Regions:
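A late C-terminal transmembrane helix in Major Facilitator Superfamily
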Residues: 325-364, 370-374
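Conserved MFS/SLC helix-loop-helix module at the cytosolic interface between two early adjacent transmembrane helices
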Residues: 55-93
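Intracellular juxtamembrane helix-capping segments at the cytosolic ends
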Residues: 108-121, 314-328
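Helix-loop-helix hairpin linking two adjacent transmembrane segments in secondary transporters
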Residues: 92, 123-124, 131-183
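Cytoplasmic helix-loop-helix junction between adjacent transmembrane helices
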Residues: 100-135
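Helix-to-loop junctions at the C-terminal end of transmembrane segments
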Residues: 56-68, 258-271, 359
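Structural signature of the two symmetry-related core transmembrane helices
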Residues: 71-85, 274-289
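Extracytoplasmic gate region of multi-pass secondary transporters
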Residues: 24-25, 207-250, 254-259
Length: 390
């Protein structure tokens, strides 16, 4: 199978790995009012999805071994579509249940995508990783921008959430023939697992795996914390839901150039620590700005959102790219990313819930402080990972 065809399929699947999640925050206040939910319970919807992403990430290497990487990848994205359909029923139970299915599918798919890139697109792993993360961001941008208009057009917030089943199932159908043609050649060509990294076991004793887990915990906490609470935060500042949803869409768009360019630059220059540190600094400055000066004259919120998005846009793919660069083959990449993403998503799943509780109890400043703590954890991990050859 030609690498370009595999890349096309990967991009189609990846576009669905944030769309279902990003469509919920602009509707969060509407959902709360309609279903009578507290901020903590409304945050649990997103937290449940992200925690199930952690479960899916931990299970990813076992799913890879049992069902085959390419076939399991298609099935995981199909599960995202099914979960979106379940969320089309306007009830708190189905909202949470559908989010659980979506989260598990995203978690498994994220691990398997790293292995597919290592196996079929290893020559340009940094660019390929940046490309599929950009596809994820485009999906998130479209979803967040259209969430409120779709709710108005289709007659309710539940329809706006359910509609994202369509692209997920279409992408699965596109991937099916690619998976059928790539599975056997890939299996025949794959080298045996390296010492200490087994397909069915997570590499807890591996230094890179542990450090990238800490890194992903920091960047994922910041990403999903802002994804869940950026629009509601500015709702609380007096913005309309449409304007807050547009800010979230701009936040998503701002991630795209960083995700596309920075991993490739880091790969070419062999300066992973420099770029990771620069991106973390951008996200931290934006977070501090949003906390200290949420509504300075005219353009302030947009500047903070773009600084945050630029830093987080490159932060996530840099964490995946360093795994692809420093692991010997696809099985090792899947196992290492499974541990890193599992730990990262566990932290990120707890963060929106904790932030929701803090919003109810103390207000948004205490909630945003959680994100600054995550930035400190990420900074330590960046320093310890270092550059290649250290």
């Amino acid at each position: 199978m030609r690498p370009a065809v595999v890349l096309l399929g990967v991009l189609a699947l990846a576009a669905n790995l944030r769309a279902a999640l990003a469509g919920y925050p602009p509707l969060l206040e509407t959902v709360r009012a309609d279903l009578g939910l507290s901020a903590a319970v409304a945050g649990l919807v997103q937290a449940g999805a992200v925690l199930m992403m952690a479960v899916g990430s931990f299970a990813g290497s076992s799913v890879d071994a049992r069902f085959g990487r390419e076939q399991a990848l298609g099935g995981a994205v199909a599960l995202v579509g099914v979960g979106s359909l379940v969320r089309g029923v306007p009830h708190a139970g189905t909202l949470i249940g559908g989010s659980i299915l979506i989260g598990f599918g995203i978690g498994v798919a994220g691990v398997l995508l790293t292995g597919v890139v290592k196996e079929h697109l290893a020559a340009r792993a940094g660019a390929a990783t940046g490309g599929y993360v950009v596809a994820m961001m485009i999906g998130a941008t479209v979803s967040s921008a259209l969430a409120v208009p779709l709710a108005v057009l289709l007659g309710g917030w539940s329809w706006s959430l359910a509609v994202w089943a369509v692209p997920a199932l279409l992408a699965t159908a596109l991937w099916a023939p690619i998976a059928a043609r790539t599975r056997e050649p890939a299996a025949a060509a794959a080298p045996p697992p390296a010492d200490g990294v087994q397909v069915r076991r997570l590499p807890w004793n591996d230094r890179l795996a542990r450090l990238t887990a800490c890194y992903q915990a920091g960047t994922s906490t910041m990403f999903y914390g802002w994804l869940t609470w950026l629009a509601p935060y500015y709702d609380s500042q007096g913005w309309s839901p449409q304007r807050a949803g547009l800010l979230l869409a701009v936040w998503s768009v701002g991630q795209i150039p960083a995700a596309l360019l920075v991993p490739a630059l880091a790969e070419r220059r062999r300066r992973w620590r420099f770029w990771a540190s620069l991106m973390l600094a951008s996200a931290t400055v934006g977070t501090l700005g949003a906390l200290a000066l949420p509504l300075p004259p005219v353009v302030g919120p947009w500047i903070w959102a773009l600084l945050i998005s630029f830093g987080l846009g490159a932060g996530f793919p840099l964490g995946l790219a360093v795994i692809a660069w420093r692991t010997p083959h696809g099985a090792a990449s899947a196992a290492t990313s499974g541990l890193a993403l599992g730990i990262g998503y566990t932290a990120a799943g707890v963060a929106p819930l904790v932030m929701g509780v803090l919003v109810d109890v103390s207000g948004y400043p205490a909630a945003i402080a959680v994100l600054l703590l995550a930035a400190a954890v990420q900074a330590v991990a960046i320093w310890r990972i270092g550059d290649r050859g250290e």
